[in-house]
């Protein structure tokens, strides 16, 4: 996965099959997501769609949000890619890593709809962050225990963190047993036995319950995602100067009315 975490969406290069078959290459980069109602006007304004040339294709991607190139090809539908981009902007921090872990260790994905189903059910994936005491304690080089440990060690620390019997045994006497215990090997055994898949910041419970890749149709995912995305955009949209001026004027008028009313009431007392 590229360095960009793609929570701001991603860029695709859109071309037109009709012009391409006529020997003319027309394609333009487009940033997703965009409001669905603005897609066709955008395509027309960039000369990519007209009455005789309506079918578009994706000629390139500026990086892929996940390591599953088989679902990102020239036949990807722009409306579906747009919904996927919306899904990414709505994800909580950390969910991108969980989804990638599920892609790496779960069932192979063949279609964009399956990926969107995975994203839609991100909170149901059997993927868990490493979590143990002192994981964020820094050493003299300002690296945390999480950063300097292997995934195998981080998994062992996580699984054993709340095992009081284990730690009582390891810390018995002067704690020599603790220095002899191989946490890295503990994690390796779990991997070799097929129990887990290990990543940099999280692990996959291979025996856990996995969400279905065809749980929701594109229409279901699209309808809910677009509504949520539009709501988020409306909340984040800054007020226009005219709206601010109108609100200030209304507030001033209200304050003046309250002041006059207050004076009148005071005179009656």
Question: Which residue ranges define each predicted feature?
Answer:
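Structured domain cores in non-transmembrane regions
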Residues: 37-117
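Short, surface-exposed beta-strand/loop "edge" segments at domain boundaries and coil↔beta transitions
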Residues: 19-24, 64-68, 210-213
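N-terminal ordered "arm"
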Residues: 2-52
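Ordered hydrophobic segments in well-structured contexts
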Residues: 9-15, 27-31, 55-60, 195-206
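Non-Sec secretion/translocation targeting segments of pathogen effectors
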Residues: 182, 237-269
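Extracytoplasmic/secretory-pathway segments with low complexity and glycosylation-like composition
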Residues: 112-164
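Conserved NAD+-utilizing ADP-ribose enzyme module
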Residues: 128-130, 149, 153-154, 199, ...
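Glycine-rich, aromatic-bearing surface loops/beta-hairpins
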Residues: 161, 166, 170-234
């Amino acid at each position: 996965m590229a360095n960009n975490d793609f929570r701001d969406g991603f860029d695709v290069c859109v071309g037109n099959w009709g012009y391409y078959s006529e020997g003319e290459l027309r394609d333009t980069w487009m940033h997703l997501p965009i409001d669905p109602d603005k897609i066709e006007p955008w395509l027309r304004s960039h000369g990519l769609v007209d009455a005789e040339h309506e079918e578009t294709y994706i000629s390139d991607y500026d990086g892929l949000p996940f390591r599953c190139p088989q679902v990102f090809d020239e036949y990807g539908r722009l409306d579906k890619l747009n919904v996927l981009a919306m899904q990414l902007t709505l994800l909580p921090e950390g969910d991108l890593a969980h989804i990638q872990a599920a892609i790496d260790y779960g069932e192979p994905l063949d279609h964009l709809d399956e990926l969107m189903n995975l994203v839609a059910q991100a909170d149901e994936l059997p993927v868990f962050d490493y979590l143990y005491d002192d994981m964020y304690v820094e050493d003299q080089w300002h690296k945390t225990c999480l950063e300097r440990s292997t995934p195998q060690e981080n998994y062992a620390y996580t699984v054993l963190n709340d095992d009081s019997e284990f730690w009582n045994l390891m810390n018995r006497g002067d704690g020599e047993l603790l220095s002899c215990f191989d946490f890295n090997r503990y994690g390796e055994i779990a991997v070799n036995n097929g129990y887990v898949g290990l990543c940099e910041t999280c692990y996959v419970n291979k025996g856990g319950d996995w969400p279905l890749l065809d749980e929701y149709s594109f229409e279901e995912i699209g309808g809910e995602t677009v509504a949520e995305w539009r709501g988020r955009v409306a909340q984040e949209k800054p007020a226009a100067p005219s709206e601010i001026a109108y609100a200030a004027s209304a507030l001033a008028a209200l304050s003046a009315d309250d002041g006059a009313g207050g004076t009148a009431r005071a005179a009656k007392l």
